[in-house]
A protein has these predicted regions:
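Extended amphipathic coiled-coil helices
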Residues: 7-10, 14-174
């Protein structure tokens, strides 16, 4: 019986022959090089009409949504140039093109609110000049401008901006 087993083992070895296993390891390195833009030089060329319509459709929160699309788009890391690192203190971080600066949080929120409103207004004017008519969208933005005159609404908008700047801080690569 032992002889039979030896013979079976030898036959199996002959059938399988020399089996060589080649294991290949491949490592792909992808380097994405980009230059972080200064907060005042943020690039908005990637925004489409659809992006603007989407933001304005959020009525009172159109500005926080626009901030997300501009400053926290994973595909536009060069615009990751502003954030709030600690919700409890009164500062925000802004990049000026060379270095990060601690900035008064309320000042930067007022700044960013006004700046993004101007961007939307310019887009609406551009649409009118080109003959594109989005009456519902224009009406929504006009309503937003009227509602934001009330301090309660304005405070909610500013709070939402603060949350956007804080909640997306992890996208920023210092």
């Amino acid at each position: 019986q032992l002889e039979d087993q030896k013979q079976q083992i030898n036959e199996l070895i002959k059938k399988t022959g020399n089996t060589t296993t080649n294991i290949t390891y491949q490592q792909n390195n992808v380097n994405n090089n980009f230059k972080l833009l200064g907060y005042r030089n943020t690039d908005i060329s990637h925004l489409s009409d659809k992006d603007f319509i989407s933001c304005i459709s959020h009525s009172n929160f159109c500005i926080p949504h626009l901030i997300k699309k501009i400053h926290f788009d994973p595909d536009k890391p060069e615009n990751h140039n502003i954030y709030i690192s600690n919700i409890k203190n009164n500062y925000a971080m802004t990049y000026d093109g060379d270095k990060w600066n601690l900035t008064n949080r309320d000042d930067i929120i007022n700044d960013i609110l006004e700046e993004k409103e101007i961007i939307i207004e310019e887009k609406l004017e551009e649409w009118l000049e080109k003959g594109k008519k989005y009456p519902e969208i224009m009406k929504k933005f006009t309503r937003y401008l009227e509602k934001k005159e009330h301090d309660v609404v304005l405070d909610k908008i500013k709070d939402e901006i603060k949350l956007v700047l804080f909640n997306n801080r992890n996208l920023i690569k210092n």
